[in-house]
């Protein structure tokens, strides 16, 4: 079982927005939500036209890595139980992690209209 911590990059069954199914994908652990739940941010290898996406490259990892340059998507958050986390693949350095947190806070402060 994964022992998550803020800044960890883990593999988790990430739900589609319509909850029709899930896909195993990486996610950045943002915060402990209590009772074994964690707030996660979706990570993708596709550079969608998401202006909020934050590039994750090998240089941004304190440990581990992803197979390819990837993108954290601060507008794609969800809460998951620790039991759904399959593995930890890395841990971000402070700077990229803080960029993600700042983007989430900005998005929420703007009421989602950023």
Task: Please name every model-derived segment.
Residues 18-20, 68:
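Coiled-coil-like amphipathic alpha-helices with heptad-repeat character
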Residues 20-23, 29-63:
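Compact nucleic-acid interaction/catalytic patches
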Residues 62-114:
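C-terminal terminal-subdomain/extension
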């Amino acid at each position: 079982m994964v022992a998550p911590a803020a800044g960890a990059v883990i593999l988790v069954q990430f739900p589609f927005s319509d909850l029709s199914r899930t896909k195993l994908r990486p996610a950045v652990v943002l915060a402990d939500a209590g009772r074994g739940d964690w707030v996660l941010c979706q990570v993708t290898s596709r550079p969608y036209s998401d202006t909020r996406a934050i590039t994750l490259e090998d240089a941004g990892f304190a440990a581990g890595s992803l197979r390819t340059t990837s993108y954290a998507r601060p507008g794609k958050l969800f809460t998951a139980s620790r039991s759904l986390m399959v593995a930890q693949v890395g841990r971000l350095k402070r700077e990229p992690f803080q960029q993600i947190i700042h983007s989430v806070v900005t998005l929420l402060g703007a009421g989602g209209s950023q």
